[in-house]
Regions:
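Class I S-adenosyl-L-methionine-dependent methyltransferase catalytic core
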Residues: 1-214
Length: 214
Protein backbone atom coordinates (compact mmCIF):
# COMPACT_ATOMS: atom_id res chain seq x y z
CA UNK A 1 0.00 0.00 0.00
CA UNK A 2 1.25 3.51 -0.85
CA UNK A 3 0.41 7.00 0.30
CA UNK A 4 -1.59 8.69 -2.44
CA UNK A 5 -0.97 12.40 -1.88
CA UNK A 6 0.83 15.07 0.09
CA UNK A 7 4.32 15.18 1.59
CA UNK A 8 4.75 11.39 1.63
CA UNK A 9 3.13 10.66 -1.70
CA UNK A 10 4.33 7.34 -3.12
CA UNK A 11 5.81 6.13 0.17
CA UNK A 12 4.98 2.55 1.12
CA UNK A 13 3.21 1.54 4.31
CA UNK A 14 2.62 -1.99 5.55
CA UNK A 15 -0.82 -3.59 5.66
CA UNK A 16 -2.05 -5.80 8.51
CA UNK A 17 -1.85 -9.50 7.73
CA UNK A 18 -4.51 -12.13 8.21
CA UNK A 19 -8.16 -12.33 7.35
CA UNK A 20 -10.71 -10.18 9.15
CA UNK A 21 -8.06 -8.13 10.96
CA UNK A 22 -8.86 -4.98 9.01
CA UNK A 23 -10.55 -4.00 5.77
CA UNK A 24 -8.18 -1.52 4.10
CA UNK A 25 -9.88 1.19 2.07
CA UNK A 26 -9.14 0.87 -1.64
CA UNK A 27 -6.92 3.47 -3.29
CA UNK A 28 -9.84 4.83 -5.28
CA UNK A 29 -12.03 5.33 -2.22
CA UNK A 30 -9.13 6.68 -0.16
CA UNK A 31 -8.40 9.28 -2.83
CA UNK A 32 -12.08 10.20 -2.97
CA UNK A 33 -12.19 10.56 0.83
CA UNK A 34 -9.10 12.76 0.81
CA UNK A 35 -10.56 14.93 -1.94
CA UNK A 36 -13.81 15.40 -0.01
CA UNK A 37 -11.90 16.39 3.11
CA UNK A 38 -9.56 18.77 1.28
CA UNK A 39 -12.51 20.47 -0.39
CA UNK A 40 -14.35 20.80 2.94
CA UNK A 41 -11.37 22.61 4.47
CA UNK A 42 -10.61 24.77 1.41
CA UNK A 43 -7.50 22.67 0.70
CA UNK A 44 -5.75 23.74 3.90
CA UNK A 45 -5.37 21.23 6.75
CA UNK A 46 -2.69 23.15 8.67
CA UNK A 47 -4.91 23.72 11.73
CA UNK A 48 -7.01 20.57 11.44
CA UNK A 49 -7.01 18.11 14.34
CA UNK A 50 -7.98 14.64 13.16
CA UNK A 51 -9.45 11.69 15.06
CA UNK A 52 -9.23 8.37 13.21
CA UNK A 53 -11.75 6.49 15.31
CA UNK A 54 -11.31 3.02 13.79
CA UNK A 55 -7.71 2.95 12.60
CA UNK A 56 -7.64 -0.39 10.80
CA UNK A 57 -4.68 -0.10 8.45
CA UNK A 58 -4.24 3.53 9.50
CA UNK A 59 -3.94 4.59 5.86
CA UNK A 60 -6.70 7.20 5.83
CA UNK A 61 -5.39 9.00 8.89
CA UNK A 62 -1.86 8.89 7.51
CA UNK A 63 -3.18 10.46 4.29
CA UNK A 64 -4.42 13.39 6.36
CA UNK A 65 -1.04 13.82 8.06
CA UNK A 66 0.69 13.63 4.69
CA UNK A 67 -1.56 16.41 3.43
CA UNK A 68 -0.65 18.69 6.31
CA UNK A 69 -3.06 17.98 9.17
CA UNK A 70 -1.96 19.57 12.42
CA UNK A 71 -2.39 16.40 14.47
CA UNK A 72 -3.74 12.86 14.32
CA UNK A 73 -5.11 10.67 17.10
CA UNK A 74 -5.74 7.09 15.98
CA UNK A 75 -7.77 4.55 17.96
CA UNK A 76 -7.48 0.86 17.11
CA UNK A 77 -8.85 -1.92 19.29
CA UNK A 78 -6.68 -4.69 17.78
CA UNK A 79 -3.26 -4.62 19.43
CA UNK A 80 -1.30 -5.94 16.44
CA UNK A 81 -2.97 -3.55 14.03
CA UNK A 82 -2.25 -0.65 16.41
CA UNK A 83 1.42 -1.60 16.55
CA UNK A 84 1.60 -1.64 12.77
CA UNK A 85 -0.04 1.78 12.51
CA UNK A 86 2.57 3.09 14.96
CA UNK A 87 5.37 1.55 12.92
CA UNK A 88 4.03 3.05 9.70
CA UNK A 89 3.68 6.56 11.09
CA UNK A 90 7.08 6.42 12.78
CA UNK A 91 8.65 5.63 9.40
CA UNK A 92 7.14 8.79 7.93
CA UNK A 93 6.74 11.45 10.60
CA UNK A 94 9.58 12.30 12.97
CA UNK A 95 7.54 14.91 14.80
CA UNK A 96 6.08 12.74 17.58
CA UNK A 97 4.01 15.66 18.89
CA UNK A 98 1.78 15.49 15.81
CA UNK A 99 0.38 12.01 16.36
CA UNK A 100 -0.61 9.36 18.84
CA UNK A 101 -1.89 5.81 18.47
CA UNK A 102 -4.14 4.49 21.22
CA UNK A 103 -4.96 0.81 21.63
CA UNK A 104 -8.49 0.77 22.93
CA UNK A 105 -12.23 1.04 22.37
CA UNK A 106 -13.04 4.51 21.06
CA UNK A 107 -16.73 4.12 21.96
CA UNK A 108 -15.98 3.52 25.63
CA UNK A 109 -13.34 6.25 25.73
CA UNK A 110 -15.60 8.84 24.09
CA UNK A 111 -18.48 8.07 26.45
CA UNK A 112 -16.19 9.05 29.35
CA UNK A 113 -14.58 12.00 27.59
CA UNK A 114 -11.22 10.23 27.64
CA UNK A 115 -10.03 10.94 24.12
CA UNK A 116 -6.80 12.97 23.96
CA UNK A 117 -6.03 15.65 21.41
CA UNK A 118 -9.43 17.31 21.01
CA UNK A 119 -11.44 19.22 20.15
CA UNK A 120 -11.33 17.66 16.70
CA UNK A 121 -12.05 19.34 13.39
CA UNK A 122 -12.33 16.05 11.51
CA UNK A 123 -13.42 12.57 12.59
CA UNK A 124 -12.66 9.64 10.29
CA UNK A 125 -15.12 6.76 10.66
CA UNK A 126 -14.21 3.58 8.80
CA UNK A 127 -15.41 0.72 11.02
CA UNK A 128 -15.96 -2.86 9.84
CA UNK A 129 -19.00 -2.95 7.56
CA UNK A 130 -20.85 -5.19 10.02
CA UNK A 131 -20.60 -2.41 12.59
CA UNK A 132 -23.58 -0.46 11.27
CA UNK A 133 -24.59 3.16 11.69
CA UNK A 134 -26.00 3.09 15.24
CA UNK A 135 -22.64 2.89 17.09
CA UNK A 136 -21.24 5.59 14.80
CA UNK A 137 -24.14 7.87 15.68
CA UNK A 138 -23.57 7.12 19.37
CA UNK A 139 -19.87 7.94 19.03
CA UNK A 140 -20.54 11.28 17.35
CA UNK A 141 -23.12 12.21 19.99
CA UNK A 142 -20.68 11.38 22.78
CA UNK A 143 -17.85 13.33 21.15
CA UNK A 144 -20.14 16.34 20.88
CA UNK A 145 -21.49 16.05 24.42
CA UNK A 146 -17.99 15.66 25.88
CA UNK A 147 -16.70 18.82 24.16
CA UNK A 148 -14.45 16.87 21.80
CA UNK A 149 -15.67 18.43 18.55
CA UNK A 150 -14.67 21.85 17.30
CA UNK A 151 -17.48 24.10 16.02
CA UNK A 152 -18.39 23.07 12.49
CA UNK A 153 -16.40 19.84 12.69
CA UNK A 154 -16.69 17.34 9.85
CA UNK A 155 -17.12 13.57 10.08
CA UNK A 156 -16.35 11.21 7.20
CA UNK A 157 -18.23 7.90 7.40
CA UNK A 158 -17.37 4.98 5.11
CA UNK A 159 -19.89 2.14 5.05
CA UNK A 160 -21.40 -0.56 2.87
CA UNK A 161 -23.49 0.97 0.10
CA UNK A 162 -26.29 -1.45 0.97
CA UNK A 163 -26.54 -0.02 4.50
CA UNK A 164 -28.02 3.23 5.72
CA UNK A 165 -25.72 6.09 6.56
CA UNK A 166 -25.44 7.79 9.94
CA UNK A 167 -27.81 10.64 10.79
CA UNK A 168 -27.07 11.72 14.36
CA UNK A 169 -28.90 14.69 15.82
CA UNK A 170 -26.99 17.94 15.42
CA UNK A 171 -25.28 16.88 12.18
CA UNK A 172 -26.15 17.64 8.59
CA UNK A 173 -25.15 15.53 5.59
CA UNK A 174 -22.97 17.64 3.32
CA UNK A 175 -22.18 15.07 0.67
CA UNK A 176 -22.85 11.42 -0.18
CA UNK A 177 -20.90 9.42 -2.77
CA UNK A 178 -21.01 5.79 -3.83
CA UNK A 179 -18.06 3.78 -5.13
CA UNK A 180 -19.16 0.26 -6.03
CA UNK A 181 -20.03 -1.54 -2.79
CA UNK A 182 -18.83 1.40 -0.67
CA UNK A 183 -20.56 4.64 0.27
CA UNK A 184 -18.86 7.66 1.79
CA UNK A 185 -20.84 10.31 3.68
CA UNK A 186 -19.49 13.69 4.77
CA UNK A 187 -21.30 15.09 7.80
CA UNK A 188 -20.95 18.47 9.49
CA UNK A 189 -21.71 19.27 13.11
CA UNK A 190 -24.07 22.24 13.16
CA UNK A 191 -25.18 22.19 16.80
CA UNK A 192 -21.95 23.53 18.32
CA UNK A 193 -23.73 26.07 20.50
CA UNK A 194 -25.56 23.32 22.36
CA UNK A 195 -22.39 21.77 23.77
CA UNK A 196 -19.64 22.89 26.10
CA UNK A 197 -16.20 23.06 24.46
CA UNK A 198 -14.13 23.45 27.59
CA UNK A 199 -12.02 20.32 26.96
CA UNK A 200 -9.34 21.83 24.68
CA UNK A 201 -6.66 19.25 25.51
CA UNK A 202 -3.19 19.01 24.07
CA UNK A 203 -2.09 15.96 22.15
CA UNK A 204 0.19 14.85 24.99
CA UNK A 205 -2.46 15.20 27.68
CA UNK A 206 -1.98 12.80 30.58
CA UNK A 207 -4.90 10.51 29.79
CA UNK A 208 -4.82 6.96 31.23
CA UNK A 209 -4.97 5.19 27.88
CA UNK A 210 -2.59 2.70 26.37
CA UNK A 211 -0.27 4.13 23.74
CA UNK A 212 1.29 1.73 21.27
CA UNK A 213 5.05 1.82 20.73
CA UNK A 214 7.32 -0.45 18.76
Amino acid sequence: MRIIGGEWRGRKIEEPRGRDVTRPTTDRVREACASMVMSAFDFDLDEVRVLDAFGGSGALGIEMLSRGARSLITFEIDRNAARLITKNIESLCRDRSRWRVVTGDVLASASRGRVPGGPFDLVLLDPPYAFGAAPVEELLRNLAQQGLLAPGAFALFEHAASDAGAHPAGFETVREKRYGITSVDLLRWVAADECDHANDSDIDEDVPLEDTHE
